[in-house]
């Protein structure tokens, strides 16, 4: 004679189902890629125009993911002199690269290390009338000191926040506008239009934290 304890079997089945559900949930948790903190030195963003003439020259396109200058459409930001473009929105001039991505940006007021999250409500793309990173002394990332020094210096406590061309995020702190990032730059003797900057790249889609 075989006796079957139905209640005991139901308990065991429920326990098995709960175990399988837990294992399934654990397996479904995404494995996040590590956040990357990088330093870029001596990135040249030269103009070809003479002083007093309208700016000309190619924009230098940069990829946060690839950690280097790129030639294709997979760029996130682009530099020429003090101007920084994002790969999203519309061009303001014919000599700018086409915007093919969904990049955006804004200038955050706060020390680089204290900016731990992206405020998505502040993100803007480039347009025909304005850039996501404002141009002009005191408006975006730099001050122009004028005569007699004519120095261009990063504004302390300004952090650039970017959405990349494919929807990831990065924050950037510009350290210097002069070659080799001299502690006391001289606009007459140090080579200008050469960037040194730090950046932190969040490679995981939909994650807005830099922690």
Locate each region found by the language model.
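N-terminal secretory signal peptides that target proteins for export/translocation
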Residues: 1-9
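Sec-dependent signal peptide recognition
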Residues: 10-18
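C-terminal motif of bacterial Sec signal peptides marking the signal peptidase cleavage site
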Residues: 21-24
């Amino acid at each position: 004679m075989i006796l079957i304890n139905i209640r005991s079997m139901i308990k065991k089945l429920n326990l098995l189902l709960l175990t399988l559900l837990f294992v399934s949930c654990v397996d479904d948790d995404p494995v996040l890629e590590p956040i990357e903190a990088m330093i870029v030195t001596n990135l040249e963003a030269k103009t070809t125009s003479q002083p007093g003439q309208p700016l000309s020259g190619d924009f230098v396109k940069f990829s946060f993911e690839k950690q280097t200058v790129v030639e294709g459409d997979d760029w996130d930001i682009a530099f020429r002199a003090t101007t920084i473009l994002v790969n999203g929105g519309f061009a303001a001039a014919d000599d700018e690269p086409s915007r093919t991505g969904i990049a955006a940006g804004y200038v955050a007021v706060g020390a680089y290390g204290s900016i731990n999250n992206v405020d998505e409500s502040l993100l803007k793309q480039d347009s025909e009338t304005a850039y996501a990173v404002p141009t002009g002394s005191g408006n975006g990332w730099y001050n122009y000191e004028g005569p007699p020094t004519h120095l261009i210096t990063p504004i302390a406590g300004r952090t650039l926040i970017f959405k990349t061309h494919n929807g990831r995020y990065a924050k950037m702190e510009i350290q210097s506008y002069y070659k080799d990032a001299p502690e006391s730059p001289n606009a007459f003797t140090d080579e200008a239009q050469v960037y040194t900057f730090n950046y932190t790249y969040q490679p995981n889609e939909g994650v807005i934290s830099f922690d």
